[in-house]
């Protein structure tokens, strides 16, 4: 008789650790997004103290559900000094649970990764907000992130015959017509934001956009850009005439500082969605 030691180990492991609902939420999120940073993990596990959080993380690591690594991010904002972030990906048991292959690398360096981690953090807050005390999910708050918005990949705004403009929102709550954009660096090309106002009004009819920015200065700058574009016209098709950006477009695009959002996220989400 042949003894399968791997099955014995798996069996013992399952007896010694029982996955809680928040564990499953965390693992599902990692499975969907490939990796996760420690702040987002804490939001999903809903642990009030660092000790409780890390005790649970160590438990999940010890039974091969997740792996811990350190990501180096080089950012001009930090004078090119490397910043290390704690990140997690699925390990052996986690991959088995969701039928995923073991992830060998975690993310990429630079601003792109920094932006993605912020998107995951905000998405994690939306995920917690949509679940009630009984673990039921509010379907109105089903959301999609840029990585899965395949039907947006070919969206174009035609400014003129030579220029094409493609947009994929960071987070889309489709049932509520709500877009959430994380904008860590306000671009010097102001036309970028004029195109966004135009796109949300005419091409997809999503005129409810929340812009999460990194500072109060960026907030003031972006609001001013939006106000200056009120009444501007854009041509998005070679056949159709130019159309105007509504004069109240700036009022329909909310700008919020990220730190303010993270301090009381439930308050902001209740305000934006009309849900408690």
Q: Where do the model's predicted regions map?
A:
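Nuclease-adjacent, charged terminal/linker segments that flank catalytic cores
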Residues: 1-106
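Hydrophobic, Leu/Ile/Phe/Ala-enriched alpha-helical segments that form helix-helix packing faces
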Residues: 45, 57, 61, 122-133, ...
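Short glycine/proline-enriched coil/turn segments at helix->beta-strand junctions
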Residues: 47, 174-178, 204-207
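Active-site metal-binding core of divalent-cation-utilizing nuclease and nuclease-like domains
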Residues: 78, 123-124, 134-179, 184-190
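Amphipathic alpha-helical dimerization/coiled-coil segments
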Residues: 93-143
